[in-house]
Amino acid sequence: MIDPMLPLPGLSRVGGKSVVACFDGGLLSSDAGILAVREVERRLGVADRLAACLEDPRASEQIIHGLADIIRFRLLMIAAGYEDGNDATSLRRDPMFRMALDQLPSGRALCSQSTVSRLENLPDPRALLRVARAIVDLYCRSLRQVPKRIALDIDDTFDAAHGGQQFRLFNAHYYDEYGFQPIVVFDGDMRTATGGNEDHRNPTQA
């Protein structure tokens, strides 16, 4: 039987200080699990790979939050169930998210919602293609050996819009709502192979 009081070892140091996660402190935070997610992201280098696909138009001397850190924050938000970029406003001072972004709990705040929004509007079509290729590269690196064949499941998913976002369109197939409909590609083991933008129609309508 596993002792629930044992600490979780192997977490990376932050600001030169050791990080120890224990399970004997009660319900202190609902987002402590992102420290484990952070370790996975570090090993795969997802944020750094995606950031390398983008061109940062900002003046280097004025940059506070690098593209990789903004992407990493957004990835961790989604992993923790905060799918809306507006949640960055309340999470930018959350101690767990600060630690996941290599900041001490008392360190500076993470990027704001407006910074996240600018990031999401930054990529042009060529950058999006580079991002898709980077995801494919991550997928290929996850394979222990070259398979004889790969079965791909290509499907769409719907992301409802709750305002006047750019490029939102009405889709009668999903509850008569406005939103976005990206395409996602999985293999037979349900690993994400890649994703892409959409033409705002259901595949059955295309």
PLM segments and residue spans:
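Dynamic "connector" segments at or just before major functional cores
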Residues: 1-204
